């Protein structure tokens, strides 16, 4: 069988994932405003795809052509364009459908041509007092370097100022980072109507207010556009430059190459050609004629308006009642390991533990690594307070966290100014593990408390991402977490681990060993099986090992949210592999590895997907669940996920996103069922 038939291209698999998001926008069982928000999620995901996946593909094509090689990537580029175009057409149809449905619910997203006289007067006042100060037209002339000053993925209005035969072209940035994208208008009769207007359309309506008195014109026309840049920064540098200086420098220079140009499809041809030329759009780039509005990612924040049933019914965060039995978090964790599962559990327990550590006289030291933290991070505040209280605080800051580089540079400087010892990863070795280690003097001993997680220390994402936190004082684990921090500080010194899987040290070898053990058990007639929950499965070495397991009779069950290169149910190769994906109100983000081990199941929670970069080129940590209670909880949750009959889709060779048929099984929406399961665990004794 040819190699191309054994693996799905990861870029196409990623687009199929985003099409599952679009399915949620189309799903009429979802509340109306949530469907509109899924359109925003789809758009945001697609922007990231072009910044990262498409940009990487473009670089591969250019390198291949420079070397005179026949590039498969060129053919893949055509497949991508075709798939995106089809999905975008579905997107446009869904958006129009949802607008009609919103109107039936008395919510009206109107444009500048639909304003009443009262609303027109109100908008001019709004523009004058709240918006005008953020608007500065940029006139395009022969010397204008659009690539230099256009912001990545910002929407602009390209304006035609027509005077006789003469046309001038200014650009207006839509300042949605300073003014709300959705503006509520004064209601008209009947009062129950809730009219809103997009910021884009306010600018369209107020073009006269912007240009009158500065230009003579016969007509003003405005068309929307945006440009997406390659997200990889060029860090070619002198050897003595620090990583923070490099990242700061690269972020100040908006010179990453464009990879996508999106424009309003009725934009005049002359304007399109002028903008393409100014943006140096090449034949490798994506050129997308789109609708009137771009940056639908703002629709993620579509406001709660109208009836309560237009949004999801709230699921209050659950407290882990074990903490309520003790005077502080340390006593609770020392008594037994604690497993938290977000967003079902509240993230407050982790925040409170770090707050307590910041002033507890018994705490000697805190070490933590941050990858993406919230804008107003209480974790950062706790580390600063701990330093002020003379604790020895070490914060490992990952400066190369894509899209969070600027924020992490800010935090690194703020922490350093507060006296925190800040260290960075070695260039080319990102730290993606989710760890902290608290050292506490208890009698004559120093007891260590560790956190190992699957998600970031981020108050905001803990509300929408499913992730685990394991809190433990078990010395078998805490001693090895201590070694991980030593490895981070000295990445080229030898280090060994007995319990943790640590990339790039031992993860690949141990994962291969555990898969091979399942193969051996199956061949001996013993119980065998592999169950994985991942965001992405694209490492060919691991995919091939799973194929080998399937061929040997090992049942393999996979729950993959995003990219999956593995093709299930290939005769003689993957007959025993089943792959599903779940997209619902929460983003499935945790990673779980389960190996049957002849009935004595090994269960790991991990920060690492099965991608080459996570296994070989990042610092990642997977921890075994040593407490039988916690192991069983994860097994129960995994069983619920695989029993989903509402939001589960099959991953198949055709990338069809077929829903798993319910048949005669009971209706199970796994995320709601998991909430009920966690709630049952947290009942008072």
UniProtKB/Swiss-Prot annotation:
Q: Tell me how the protein is altered or processed after translation.
A: An intermediate of this reaction is the autophosphorylated ppk in which a phosphate is covalently linked to a histidine residue through a N-P bond.
Q: Does the keyword DNA damage apply?
A: no
Annotated active site: 432
Which GO biological process categories is it annotated with? Answer: polyphosphate biosynthetic process
Please tell me where Mg(2+) binds in this chain.
372, 402
| Top-level division of the source organism's lineage | Bacteria
Pfam families, from UniProt?
PP_kinase (PF02503), PP_kinase_C (PF13090), PP_kinase_C_1 (PF17941), PP_kinase_N (PF13089)
Query: Per the entry, which co-factors are needed?
Result: Mg(2+)
Q: Which residues does the annotation say bind ATP?
A: 45, 465, 561, 589
Its EC number is 2.7.4.1
Q: Catalytic activity, per the record?
A: [phosphate](n) + ATP = [phosphate](n+1) + ADP
Concerning InterPro entries, the annotation shows: PLipase_D/transphosphatidylase, PP_kinase, PP_kinase_C_1, PP_kinase_middle, PP_kinase_middle_dom_sf, PPK_C_dom2, PPK_N_dom, PPK_N_dom_sf
Q: Name one GO molecular function term.
A: polyphosphate kinase activity
* Keyword flag Zinc: no
This entry carries the following GO cellular component terms, namely: polyphosphate kinase complex
The enzyme's main class, written as a single word, is transferase
Q: What does this protein do?
A: Catalyzes the reversible transfer of the terminal phosphate of ATP to form a long-chain polyphosphate (polyP).
Q: Which PANTHER family does the protein's record reference?
A: POLYPHOSPHATE KINASE
Show the NCBIfam families listed in the entry. poly_P_kin (TIGR03705), PRK05443.1-1 (NF003917)
Q: Which HAMAP family match?
A: Polyphosphate_kinase
- Name of the featured protein: Polyphosphate kinase
Please report the organism this UniProt entry assigns to the protein: Klebsiella pneumoniae
Q: What is the lineage of its organism?
A: Bacteria, Pseudomonadati, Pseudomonadota, Gammaproteobacteria, Enterobacterales
